[in-house]
Every structure is written in structure tokens, then in C-alpha cells.
A protein has these predicted regions:
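Catalytic-core regions of glycoside hydrolase
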Residues: 113-115, 169, 181, 185-192, ...
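Extracytoplasmic
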Residues: 613-807
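Contiguous, structured surface segment used for ligand recognition
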Residues: 1-132
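N-terminal small/glycine-rich loop or linker at the start of catalytic domains
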Residues: 125-147, 210-217
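Structural motif
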Residues: 9-15, 49-56, 92-94, 141, ...
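Active-site mouth loops of central-metabolism enzymes
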Residues: 140-154, 218-226, 368
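Catalytic domains of carbohydrate-active enzymes, especially glycoside hydrolases
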Residues: 151-176
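C-terminal non-catalytic alpha-helical accessory regions
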Residues: 394-402, 414-625
């Protein structure tokens, strides 16, 4: 039905939210079409009408006879197109929220052009009820995230409205003093004042206000610290005008034993209820590396069913799967599990990108634009049946697509990802191009499938999008959601070009090193350096990179996202400022450059040439030996995989390809010439990782049963702990390491083989943890090595394994 000349009918009695419902409808359509719909207390020839069941007339109710009555927050729609040209579009909400969501459904499906608005007849007789009662997102005003810290109340309200249009009914805020840094240079407003104002905005949309409030005092054994924390909470709870619920993470962040955490939190909740007596409280048993008994104690405490706890949260960095959490909880809390999914990060997170190529990990980083509609729907539909719904964890606007997808699935999990993306493109970008944009949003997820150089879809999508981009309007080009999609497509294409070039440059440089005996060490080092520096001096796909940087500037102005550190004010590249890595070579640049420095200091030319030759043989173990980098696609084939991604997308119970963030930081800053002044092979940043005591097992075939072998292993986490001086017993990883059935060791000592990591590095030796392999472990020519972490369940990562014959 064409509604360009329609009247939005205003009943005599409207609540504040009902008035906002009509206002949002008119405002949104004016922005998209340029048409100002009249709001009037008298109906027109074509009327748009919004009601809720408990205050509408019998005449309106009669219009919906025979249409399924919705439940709480649900709605029904009639599209009545009469032959004489008159008509009515009537939204009847079960309640105020339902009325708003019914209006939002009209906006999502409206076909809007300049000067024209049409509501599809297919919406007639639609009845919907939200599937899950909790549907929300966390928007934290803190230095650590990559967008929200640059926002004022205006930006928060605009974004909250967008989220509400896709069914969100809750927003979670972060109080001041809950981040590593209290303030950000980007903050346009005081954190306390903004929190209070945004709570009013949330409430005005009929949504619930949540707080994420960890226990992060410096020392809770100090009564002075407790008093200060009590006073701070009183300051927050008394100031915030609306507060419906609070989530307390118990170990991320936080360092208290569950018994102490529960006791302390109970006192904080008493203060909460002085000011917000109806506020619910959820606790989340999150912990990076729980000590023995931590989870047992948590479940013992929760089994007491304290009245002040409303529910339990399934969150990132929890040891148990959601099924296990559900089974271990008392019945009282099983029906009140809140989900807190990390939709924001790509690696080192709750749901890492499956088998993510190193090239993307080094360029897009943990918080690059990460539209993952198919995977997010699959994860949602696996987890959500155990819950009341979710409030997603977000560190910026880069995960915007995932937010919308997740909330829409919470509203109705039978909706396809394709339909949600079509609505997203239609409502937020452009009706006329929505079908094509939705396809791009679906396709871009697959750019990260498998090895980057083997993914032809990256080039196909780039070519298709580039041609499409030339046809769209200026209004679309200036849309920040469109620009984020464009930037991601360009970034993936540029990454592939850069990776191909940098790998080729490394091969050229290594070929030069093989000529050291002929042309001399000084000459080949000089030439190899020149070749390797072409990665920085002559960037790959420079025209694409230039366009990416222009988009980054535009996005900083349009939505506040900080995509570089120095120019846009981002905190760091692993916190969303991923374009900071644009000059980082995607090859063994750091290893070779630092090796050259050491080789040049050798006094003997023969030794220098031999050392240069050895650089090219580093991953060549020699005849009868084996080298494996299990964090690579080839090396991962040696790893036993216990569960498929579909069974365990969070990798709680199965090994996965991972990337060492801090090694990558070192590789990045090598370009500046100061960070980690020792050679670091790129494979040290690529790991196979297991969490929470999950066994890691690797299989090697082709061993000689009569030969004697030793094994060398590089453990990146243990290495970096030792390198920065964490060598106490508590810093050791307790792990049973077995070859076959034989126990090789029961821990990873902080000093490998009794030698100081720093001294080994200073002496030019690579620090490996070495083990003798008993012949009985490979008597049939096959060796199985198994690692099982116990006691404190730290993550275990392995970067390299060498199986070497003994002399």
C-alpha cells in the first residue's frame, strides 16, 4: 500500500512511549524518503494507526478477529487496502513495547524511495511474539572500546533507537571506574553524567537498563578498599535514575575466590536495592585460568540459592559449556540463565573465527569489522534455548551486523540470516539497493574461510562490489554502515594482495641469502634488506590502501570509530585500530631482520655465510626428522580434533588454531626497530591452543622404531612469561606430557631445560623445551604426544614441535 500521503493517527490518550512510537515512525521515513507524514487526531483517507490492546476501541479489536493473539511484547498488523483508494494500516501491540516493535516491523519492510513510501501487503494479518524475553546489547563508555568513547548523548540515542527497531529491549551500561583507564582523551562528556543521561534515553524507549559491574577493587582484604568500593557503588546507584538489572562478573575481571566474591557482592546488592529495590542481579562465573576448586566452590555457593541472586550468566571465559552450566545449577536458576555472547572479537575470544588465516589475524586483528551472519545464527540457535535471551558483549560499532542478527534471532530464531540482512540493508542503508547489499553482507563472511591465497571469493566479491559501488547514490556512499562494509571488502582484497607480495618478497630475499658464499655476507644482507623493505616502501595495492585510509577518516567523522592509533585516537591495534598494522610485513621480516643484526656482529666471514645459509634451513629438520607448526593449516593436520565447530564453536572442548596477540604486537613494532630485539619466527605467533584442561594430542608417523629421538617444543605463553620475568612456581603451567603411555614431564618449567630464557636469547639460541622420547612410545613407527593441563587450568598453546634423531 502506498502511504506517501497518509496520516499518522494520534489517539486522544497516548503514553510517552506511544508518542515516541509515532514520532520514530515519521522521523525515520522522512529521513529515508524526504516525505513528512502528518500526525493528526483525525484519520485521513489513508491512516497509519498504532494501539495497544488495553486501551484501543472494540472497533479496532474487531479488525484482528481470527488473527493469533500475541504474547508479551508481541504485536499484530492489518494492511487494509480498499477499492476506493482508502486504507488503513493498523498496528495493535499486546503492550507498549509490542506497539513499538510492530511499528518497527513496518519500517523494516517499507519500500522507500525519494518521495515514495510503500508498505507491503504481505504484512497483513501478521502476528508475532518475541521468542526470548531478554534481547539487548552492551554499550560501554570506556577507553578500551573502539567507538562508544567518542560518543555524546546524541549518538547514543540514535544507536539505541536503531537497536530497538530490531527488537532490542535492554541496554547494558558500564559505570565509571570499571576500566583499566578511568578516562579517555576522546570522552566528550563526563562518564557519570553520561551514564545517567543514557539511562533516561533507554527508559524512554521502554527498554530495560542494565549495569555490568565487576568487583575490581585493588585489595578487598583491606577494609579501606571495601569502604571505598561501597561508597562508589552508593554514588553510582543513587545517581542513575533508572536501573532494572545488574550483571556481576566474578573473575573477568576480578580475582576473588567465589565465596569472597559472593559475600562482597551481597553487600553491594544491599546498596543497590536501597535505590532500585526491584533490580535483578545476575552473576557470571567467568575466569581465564581458574585455580583448583574455583568452579566447585562457585557451584557450592550457588546451590545455597541466595535470594539476592536472580539468575546466572553464560559468558566468555567460562569453563563449562552452557549444557553443563544448566545441569549444575539449581532449578531456581535454570529458568533464569542470561546469555552474554562475545560477538565483538575475532580471535583470543569466546567464538574465534574458525581456522582464521594468519594474514587476516595480522591485519584485521581482534576487532576488525566482523559481519558473521551465518555463524552468529548458528551459535545463537545452539545456545539460546537454555537461556532467557541475551545481552551481547560489544567493544564498538564494528560488530553492528552481529548485534542486529543476534537481537533478531532472539525475537524469532526461525528467521533466516538472509532475511535479517535484507531488512538491515533496507532500513539502514537503502531500499533500492537492499537486495544486493544484503548479498554482500552474507558473502563477506566467507572471505575469511580457509587460506587467504586459495580463496577466490575474495577477488570475486571485490570486483562485484567495486562495480556496484559506482552505481550507488551519494547518500548511500555517505552511510557509515555501507562504508564499514566497503572498508571490509577492500581490506580483505588488500590483505590478499599484500600477503601474496610479502611472501614473494621473502622468497626473493631468501634466494639472495643462498648466494652468500659467492657475493659475500655484507652484500647479500644489504640486498635482502632492500628487498624485504619493499613491503613497507612500495605498499601492495596502494590505490586500495589509499581508499581504505580515506574511509577510515570518513568513518571517524560519521560514527566515531577509531581505526588507527595516531590519527584517529584508537587505544591500540588489537582494540580496533587495525589499520595501524598496514605497514607490517606479512612474512618473516622480523626474524630475518633481527637475525641479520646478529650475523653482522660475527667476526668470521665463513661463520657469517654459514649462519645466513642456516636461516633458509630453519624449518628443515633434516633427513629422518620432523618439524611441525601446528598453528598452520598444514601443521594442524597432526592435531586430534575432538569436536566439530558446529558442536563446539567456543572451542571449550577441542583444540583450535589460534594467534598469539603479544607476539603479533612484537612483530608490528619491529618496523620501528626497538621491540623484542631478538629474532622471532612468524610461527611463534601461530599456535594450536586448548582451554580449561582439554587434552591436546598430536600424531607423527614415519619414525624409525630402532632410532633414538628427542622432542623440542616451543610454548609461546610460557616463553613470554619467562621473558618478562614471571618465573615463580605459580607461573608454571602444570601439565602432564606423555609420549604414548610414558609420562615425559608433569609441568612446563618457566626456564626451559634449566636455562634462563633471556640468557638463551642473548646467546643467540632459540629457547625450546626438550624431552627424550622412549622407544616404546613409537615402536610401531607412530608417535602420539599428549598434553593434559591440570591444577590451575591455564590455556595451553604450542607453536612448534620438532622430532629429532639423536646422534
Amino acid at each position: 500500500m502506498e502511504i506517501t500521503s497518509a496520516v499518522v493517527y494520534k489517539p486522544q490518550l497516548q503514553t510517552a512511549l506511544e508518542k515516541k512510537t509515532a514520532d520514530v515512525f515519521c522521523k525515520n521515513l522522512k529521513k529515508r524518503s524526504g516525505v513528512s507524514l502528518l500526525q493528526s487526531k483525525t484519520s485521513g483517507k489513508i491512516s497509519i494507526e498504532f494501539y495497544k490492546e488495553d486501551s484501543c476501541s472494540e472497533e479496532v479489536k474487531a479488525l484482528f478477529d481470527g488473527i493469533t493473539v500475541p504474547g508479551k511484547e508481541g504485536f499484530r498488523i492489518r494492511v487494509i487496502d480498499n477499492p476506493d483508494g482508502s486504507g488503513r494500516i493498523v498496528v495493535l501491540g499486546k503492550d507498549e513495547r509490542g506497539e513499538f516493535y510492530g511499528m518497527a516491523r513496518l519500517l523494516r519492510k517499507a519500500i522507500v524511495k525519494k518521495g515514495s513510501i510503500e508498505i507491503p501487503d504481505e504484512l497483513d494479518s501478521l502476528s508475532m511474539t518475541p521468542q526470548y524475553p531478554l534481547r539487548g546489547h552492551q554499550l560501554g563508555y570506556r577507553d578500551k572500546n573502539n567507538t562508544y568513547g567518542a560518543w555524546s548523548k546524541k549518538e547514543f540515542e540514535a544507536y539505541i533507537e536503531d537497536l530497538a527497531l530490531f527488537g532490542a529491549n535492554a541496554i547494558e551500561l558500564l559505570p565509571p571506574k570499571t576500566d583499566d583507564r578511568l578516562y579517555s582523551a576522546l570522552f566528550p562528556e563526563d562518564p557519570m553524567e553520561l551514564m545517567c543521561e543514557v539511562s533516561k534515553i533507554i527508559h524512554s524507549y521502554g527498554m530495560d537498563v542494565w549495569l555490568w559491574y565487576p568487583n575490581v577493587g585493588r585489595d578487598y582484604h583491606d577494609f579501606g578498599c571495601i569502604d571505598r568500593e561501597m561508597e562508589e557503588r552508593r554514588r553510582v546507584f543513587s545517581a542513575i535514575p533508572y536501573l532494572d538489572a545488574m550483571l556481576v562478573p566474578l573473575g573477568d575481571p576480578g580475582s576473588l575466590w567465589p565465596t569472597d566474591a559472593m559475600c562482597l557482592t551481597e553487600h553491594f546488592v544491599e546498596i543497590l536495592h536501597e535505590y532500585h529495590p526491584e533490580a535483578g542481579v545476575w552473576v557470571a562465573p567467568q575466569h581465564f585460568q581458574p585455580e583448583p576448586g574455583w568452579y566447585d566452590t562457585f557451584y557450592e555457593e550457588i546451590a545455597k540459592e541466595p535470594d539476592w541472586i536472580t539468575g546466572v550468566c553464560f559468558a566468555p571465559w567460562e569453563q563449562d559449556s552452557i549444557e553443563e552450566l544448566y545441569e549444575k545449577l539449581p532449578e531456581k536458576y535454570r529458568e533464569n540463565i542470561r546469555n552474554y555472547p562475545d560477538i565483538s572479537h575475532n580471535s583470543n575470544c569466546q567464538f574465534p573465527v574458525e581456522n582464521w588465516d594468519m594474514a587476516f589475524a595480522l591485519t584485521s586483528g581482534r576487532e576488525g569489522y566482523n559481519a558473521r551472519p551465518e555463524k552468529m545464527k548458528a551459535i545463537h540457535n545452539m545456545l539460546e534455548p537454555y537461556t532467557i535471551g541475551s545481552i551481547t558483549y560489544s567493544e564498538g560499532i564494528h560488530d553492528d551486523v552481529n548485534k542486529i542478527l543476534w537481537a533478531d534471532q532472539d525475537f524469532d530464531s526461525s528467521v533466516t540470516a538472509e532475511e535479517t540482512m535484507a531488512d538491515y540493508a533496507n532500513l539502514f542503508i537503502d531500499s533500492e539497493t537492499s537486495e544486493q547489499v544484503a548479498e554482500f553482507l552474507m558473502d563477506v563472511e566467507h572471505n575469511w574461510d580457509g587460506p587467504v591465497l586459495e580463496n577466490d571469493g575474495i577477488d570475486v566479491l571485490y570486483e562485484s562490489f567495486t562495480a556496484f559501488d559506482k552505481t550507488v547514490s551519494k547518500q548511500v556512499k555517505n552511510n557509515y554502515r555501507y562504508q564499514m562494509l566497503k572498508l571490509r571488502i577492500l581490506t580483505d582484497y588488500w590483505t590478499k594482495q599484500k600477503y601474496a607480495k610479502d611472501q614473494e618478497l621473502e622468497q626473493q630475499a631468501r634466494a639472495v641469502l643462498d648466494l652468500a658464499d659467492i657475493t659475500g655476507s655484507e652484500a647479500v644482507i644489504r640486498e635482502a634488506r632492500t628487498i624485504l623493505n619493499l613491503s613497507r616502501d612500495v605498499p601492495a595495492a596502494e590505490d586500495v590502501l589509499f581508499e581504505m585510509l580515506k574511509l577510515a577518516d570518513s568513518l571517524r567523522n560519521l560514527c566515531g570509530i577509531q581505526l588507527t592509533e595516531n590519527h584517529h585516537g584508537g587505544q591500540c591495534w588489537i582494540r580496533g585500530a587495525y589499520l595501524q598494522t598496514r605497514s607490517m610485513p606479512l612474512n618473516d621480516y622480523q626474524y630475518l631482520m633481527q637475525s641479520f643484526k646478529r650475523i653482522e656482529k660475527m667476526q668470521n666471514e665463513k661463520n657469517r655465510c654459514a649462519a645466513l645459509h642456516q636461516l633458509n634451513l630453519r624449518q628443515d629438520p633434516g633427513d629422518g626428522n620432523q618439524f611441525c607448526a601446528p598453528g598452520t593449516y598444514e601443521g594442524f593436520s597432526h592435531v586430534s580434533v575432538w569436536h566439530s565447530w558446529e558442536e563446539d564453536p567456543g572451542y571449550l572442548k577441542t583444540p583450535f588454531i589460534d594467534h598469539s596477540v603479544y607476539t603479533m604486537v612484537g612483530l608490528l613494532h619491529e618496523i620501528d626497530g626497538w621491540y623484542h630485539e631478538f629474532p622471532m619466527p612468524l610461527t611463534w605467533a601461530l599456535n594450536v591452543t586448548v582451554l580449561y584442561g582439554t587434552p591436546l594430542e598430536m600424531t607423527f608417523t614415519g619414525l624409525d622404531p630402532e632410532a633414538s629421538y628427542g622432542m623440542k617444543v616451543f610454548y609461546p605463553n610460557s616463553f613470554f612469561r619467562a621473558f618478562v620475568g614471571q618465573t615463580a612456581l605459580k607461573d608454571e603451567t602444570l601439565v602432564n606430557i606423555r609420549a604414548g603411555k610414558v609420562l615425559l614431564a608433569d609441568r612446563i618449567a618457566q626456564n626451559p631445560n634449566g636455562k634462563s630464557v633471556r640468557r638463551e636469547i642473548e646467546a643467540g639460541r632459540e629457547p625450546f623445551w626438550e624431552y627424550d622420547l622412549p622407544k616404546e612410545s613409537y615402536q610401531d613407527g607412530t608417535l602420539k604426544v599428549r598434553w593434559e593441563v591440570y591444577d590451575t587450568l591455564k590455556a595451553l598453546a604450542v607453536s612448534e614441535v620438532w622430532i629429532m634423531k639423536k646422534e
